[in-house]
Amino acid sequence: MHTILLVVFMIILGAIIGGVTNMIAIKMLFHPFKPYYIFRFRIPFTPGLIPKRREEIARKIGQVIEEHLITEELIRQKLNQPQSRNMIQQLIHKQISKLKNDDVTIKKIAGFLGIDVNELVDYKLTTKFLNKLNFWYESNKYRKLSEILPQSFLDQCKGQIEYITDFLCERARNYLSSEKGERDIYEMLDTFFNEKGRIIGLLQMFMTKESIADRIQHELIRLTQHPQSQKIITKVLNDEYEIFKDKNLDEIIKEQQFKNYSQLVLNELKTYLNLKDKTERPIKQVVPQFIQFLEDDTSKRMTDFIIKGTSKHLTNIMKKINLRQLVEEQINTFDLKYIENLIIDIANKELKLIMTLGFILGGIIGFFQGVIAIFV
């Protein structure tokens, strides 16, 4: 009887020691949050592992996101997908459709170009009109766009940048929230785990890949809603818009393209007998085909221009955004208690299994110690 009690006591004692040891080890991952000192000597294991390596963890997560999750190549692929093209073209269509509700007349447009429409009745319409347009183009093709267009029009264009920012953020959220986005994040995370270092391996002891991928997906979606991210995107778009305004006319519209557009306008004008009346009526009534042309042809060209321009300058955009630093700074702003609760919430089941395993292993070791004690 004494022998059995000894073995049982050793099992219980070993289980308690093993379980409590694992509980303390888990707590020491997070606690204490700051170092403690006795006189001038720092107490070992203070602060805890995660508080001590917090900046390194944030840096690694930022590196993962920038180099393997939100990459330039991935963004280029998404921009060139048919769905993205359709969304951009719909946005342009929406802006062009506003012309249908404006009272812009041909006379106003011709006046902006320095053309007296009434003179066209007395002169050879074709020669006069085309020569005038060609002269205007030759006179202005080396001038900046900001020097040619009215300030009110430039301000209106600039006012659309916030809508583009919202559109880009919304598209990013839609992708990250989709099954495809979730699968891409998991696959890239899995590849990274197979290639990269120790800190990620340490995290994987307490969190499954699915949990990490889910958390990254959640944080990326939240990042697209963060005001600072939207400010950065808006600033980049504003900078690119300023660059675009500073381009010469011939960089935007080639001479042959300008001639084609001029001929199109001329053909429309020739279809009307009462030219003066027609030129003073709104474009939406006079030349509805022109609006249709803008919707069908120009919108496609503008869509291609936006996608090609964005893809061309994507490297500079990503450098200006500095996604790695943005993520790192965001994680470093998290309260340590919040990080602890976050990890425990995600890996709660696994942590409980570790503590249970400590009790079991401690009990097994206690059993063998009891058996050895009997024979000693």
UniProtKB/Swiss-Prot annotation:
Membrane topology term: Multi-pass membrane protein
Locations listed in the record: Cell membrane
Classification via Pfam families: DUF445 (PF04286)
Membrane-traversing stretches: 4-24, 356-376
Keywords: Cell membrane, Membrane, Transmembrane, Transmembrane helix
InterPro entries recorded: DUF445, UCP032178
UniProt name for this protein: UPF0754 membrane protein SE_1527
Organism encoding this protein: Staphylococcus epidermidis (strain ATCC 12228 / FDA PCI 1200)
Taxonomic lineage from the root: Bacteria, Bacillati, Bacillota, Bacilli, Bacillales
